[in-house]
Amino acid sequence: MSLIAIERVLCGWPKICRKLIVTSRSLTSGLRRALVKQPRKGGDVGKPGMELGRCSCFGLRVNLSNASVVYVGHRRYSTYEKTSTQILTKLFPQTSEESNDEESRERRKLEEEEEQKELERAFRRMKLGFGLFGIGSMLFSFWAIYFYGRPSLDEHGNEVIDEFSCLPQMQQLMWRTWKSVNRFQRFFKEPSRKKLLPDPLQPPYVQPPYTLVLEIKDVLVHPDWTYETGWRFKKRPGVDVFLKECAKYFEIVVYTAEQGVTVFPLVDALDPNGCIMYRLVRDSTHFDGGHHVKNLDNLNRDLKRVVVVDWDRNSTKFHPSNSFSIPRWSGNDNDTTLFELTSFLSVLGTSEIDDVREVLQYYNQFSDSLSQFRENQRKLGELMHAEEVEKTSKSRPVVKNWTRGFINH
């Protein structure tokens, strides 16, 4: 118990003692009156001629009959439960077992009425809110139709004639508004500009022969979150070697659906040597079917020499023949995908292929493109070794071969 609770108990103890004394006096006086002034009820309480007995209670000596003692005891014990309940009620009001049904019903009735009134007030507020919202929406619609449906003005303030000028006034407003809505829709769905990359470098500058478009999330890095550090980005094993080797043959471009506020500082930390030449973020994508798609038509590069590396085929669904899919990285340290991808792209860059889409289409028909590339490399190595052995055997001197045959015979 706290000090405040102990103090309250000590302060209230005299009051409780006074209540106990008053209650005991009341019980004593009531019992005394019952013993001294006993009621008589004909033949119900006793028989005539019975001897009187003597009883002592709290210093009082009175004469009682046996029947009177039984009667008094009956009264005493029949009212014991009621008297004890009254004592507890006086001392501890919360332990009273008697409930006023009428007050309870009245209280429940008041609560129900108050709840009903609150529901009515809430319904009125809701109707008022819907009404204000409807009026506001109507006024805004009228303003939008007038603002976006009016004809354009030239620099001299004259109306510009368009394809809707021959229609009635109301139809002009509606069709121009609809055209403006479609323009806004294209603004949010299509890339922010027609040319995402500048024109290729001209001599004396060196323009790489191929363009490599990379997704950064789960291809080069993987976001990781912990209670101790929060969000961090983990580098994929081999990413430094991958960027360094690919920069020899490719113009490297990071093209992602992430926000620029995340991508730009991440690329600065990932590529301190500047192997990545350009960075394209979400505003450069085309939103279609719930996906941010990399639209290579706006890349300003020859698509015959563009390779897109990504794990999500929906991101390159406009140009599947230019995509090369690799497994998505989940942060494991024993991943070797970038090392294998470096070998593939190095072979592709040194082969001087005019149209890379033919090679990419061939490997896209396999579920694991890099495994198929390794198998093809193994077969090519065996074939080259066999050709080398055959060439070596054919290049032996004729005299040496004739001498060996002569000795054998």
Swiss-Prot record:
Gene Ontology annotations for the cellular component aspect, listed alphabetically: mitochondrial inner membrane; mitochondrion; nuclear speck; TIM23 mitochondrial import inner membrane translocase complex
Annotated GO MF terms: protein serine/threonine phosphatase activity; protein tyrosine phosphatase activity; ribonucleoprotein complex binding
Principal location class: mitochondrion
Mitochondrial intermembrane side: 149-409
Single biological process term from Gene Ontology: protein dephosphorylation
Signal peptide span: none
Keyword annotations: Membrane, Mitochondrion, Mitochondrion inner membrane, Protein transport, Transit peptide, Translocation, Transmembrane, Transmembrane helix, Transport
Transit peptide feature, positions: 1-42
Region (Disordered): 93-114
Biased composition (Basic and acidic residues): 102-111
Paired cysteines (S-S): none
Compartments (UniProt record): Mitochondrion inner membrane
Domain FCP1 homology: 205-348
Ranges facing Mitochondrial matrix side: 43-127
Keyword Transmembrane attributed: yes
Transmembrane portions of the chain: 128-148
Topology in the lipid bilayer: Single-pass membrane protein
Tissue expression from the record: Exclusively expressed in the testis.
Function: Essential component of the TIM23 complex, a complex that mediates the translocation of transit peptide-containing proteins across the mitochondrial inner membrane.
Family: Belongs to the TIM50 family.
Protein name per its UniProtKB record: Mitochondrial import inner membrane translocase subunit TIM50-B
Organism: Drosophila melanogaster (Fruit fly)
Higher taxonomy: Eukaryota, Metazoa, Ecdysozoa, Arthropoda, Hexapoda
Gene: ttm2
